[in-house]
Amino acid sequence: MRTVNSIRLFVLIVTLTLSTHVSNAQKIKPKNVLKDMERVADWQIEHFRDTFSIEYSKAHHIADWTNGALYVGMVKWAELAKSDKYYDWLKSVGEEQNWNLHWRPYHADDHTIGQMYIELFRKYGDSTMIAKTITGMDYIIDNPSEQPITLDKYKHLERWTWCDALFMAPPVLAKLSIITGDDKYTRFMMKEYQASTEHLFDIEENLYYRDNSYIGKLDQGNKIFWSRGNGWVFGGLTIIMEEYDEGSKEYNYFLEIYKKMAAKLIDIQTPKGHWAMSLLAQDLYPTPETSGTAFFTFGLAWGINKGILNKATYEPSVRKGWNALTSYISEDGMLGYVQPIGAAPGSAWADRTEVYGTGAFLAAGSEVYVLYGGK
């Protein structure tokens, strides 16, 4: 049986590799983008209660950050889908969770699901959906953590001491500021975001270190910039910027970071279309990885659609990224090559996925669809 499974995996890898080389030049059609999004979304919902990481013996909690990232993309797919079943599914998650955030009051990961609650509130107008998110954010603003901004081997998790956090919590605060009209959420978010950026952003490379343990550390002479970690930041920037008026001081602050990262990203994309798990070390990490690639594709397509990025310069990168992503979808709709839960460059496999990879893919598809003429 083990031999049979090994042969199947080998065939899958060869098939996906060959399809990637062919697909990079393929023209992207809006109807095909929708089909791929639907396949991946449906597969994920069907397998929502599965266990995806070998290191964990049970499925992720529905309010876990992993699923929170899935919901961000699923909301974007629900907006495009012809069926209400995706909104219904998201509402069922919120109802099962009783519209609570996850259990740790200060931890950014446990705020992620609030993004979905707020978007459902915007659609349905039911204040029950966001009441507990408001209460939770009010608490941390009124009782700010006094921990330092350094992660220090996971001793300090009450502030945004790791770059992933910049996707998880800041969009919740930005959205709350807009829907409530209270700028206290923006003020707190800006203060904490700036502190994290001053700590983790490398002004020479225009990329973020995952946390302080990687600052000054080299991998065979290369600075270590984790793909998905920077994907969290880049994807999060687009979500935050959507909430603020162009020209506002908040918008301009994030815009400057966004443009610097975008210019860097197109320079370091691999010829196959994905981004290496260690962004500056393609030779050391040749295996494709789809979660970081999806977030980058999402962010770049969004920037072109908004008129921020020059289409002639950036569209080829989006096309290569999207075609690479779709080449890693299995016949039944599973997005492969999603790096498991981690904090640094590592390994990924054609036959393994994770919910946050699906969320990133759906977010990317929502912008790729518009970029290539979708209405």
Task: Identify the meaning behind each predicted range.
Residues 87-91, 99-212, 332:
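Extended ligand-binding groove/face enriched in aromatic
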Residues 148-156, 278-282, 339-340:
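Acidic interhelical loop/turn segments
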Residues 163-167, 174-279, 286-297, 309-338, ...:
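Extended ligand-binding clefts on enzyme/binding-domain cores
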Residues 14-16, 24, 69, 168, ...:
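Generic detector of isolated residues embedded in canonical secondary-structure elements
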Residues 1-28:
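Bacterial Sec-dependent N-terminal signal peptides
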Residues 26, 31-68, 80-87, 96, ...:
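CBM-like carbohydrate-recognition segments
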